[in-house]
Amino acid sequence: METLELQGAKLRYHQVGQRPVLIFIPGANGTGDIFLPLAEQLKDHFTVVAVDRRDYGESELTEPLPDSASNPDSDYRVKRDAQDIAELAKSLSDEPVYILGSSSGSIVAMHVLKDYPEVVKKIAFHEPPINTFLPDSTYWKDKNDDIVHQILTEGLEKGMKTFGETLNIAPIDAKMMSQPADTEKGRIEQYKRTMFWSEFEIRQYTHSDITLDDFTKYSDKITLLNGTDSRDSFPQDVNFYINKETGIPIVDIPGGHLGYIQKPEGFADVLLNMWG
């Protein structure tokens, strides 16, 4: 893996291919390896970069998180993630780059576009579970508060079951999300990673400061992506609302919420049709 030293962290990332830079931002998984099957499909067309977000995988913190980062309304980590991606983009290319964020990674991508538009050539938001600008935002904020409370008091299994039911996660995705790692060490790491995401991201990222105006300013750069196998899920509803209010196009892409690993060939074909 490659390393970029930043304030407070050593950011590690996979890099394959040549030509224009395309950065993938992972969601709850946090690590870029989940994009490697997709990267193999695209490496002849892009320099594909798949990031381990700080606090995840091989990326290392060199300074501790501030105590406030676990507060439900803290924007520290999502803003720091966005800054990391912007600094990575600048280190890799003198030109604006392509960016795709999936799930909570798409929320990070939104903040990249909002705060660092100069690094973005084109950007895609794949099934973003953000609620800030929705008419029923308070309802979804309360639901996420309840889910995190349940995870922290009743355990991860019960809380994630509620999470899946509340967001209407598709069976193809629920099966993959509940699949344990192959080794005991892997299972321990998986548990720690999911608990960290639960405490530091479910509430903070989904209710972070993004508005519809942040999209309309740069609508020519944005594509919304919805999976063909995750119909009627909450993240798809978010994209439908953005589309209705701004006219930014939605493109159907193979697979579910984890389509990039479920159907990487078809996923890549759509990206190449968009950006190739």
UniProtKB/Swiss-Prot annotation:
Gene Ontology MF terms: hydrolase activity
Q: Which stretches does the entry tag as region Disordered?
A: 57-76
EC category name: hydrolase
Going by the entry's taxonomy, the superkingdom of the source organism is recorded as Bacteria
The entry's keywords: Hydrolase
* Pfam families, per database record: Abhydrolase_1 (PF00561)
Q: Indicate the segments forming the AB hydrolase-1 domain, all copies.
A: 20-137
What family does this belong to? Belongs to the AB hydrolase superfamily.
Matching PANTHER family: MONOACYLGLYCEROL LIPASE
Q: What is this protein called?
A: Uncharacterized hydrolase SAB2455
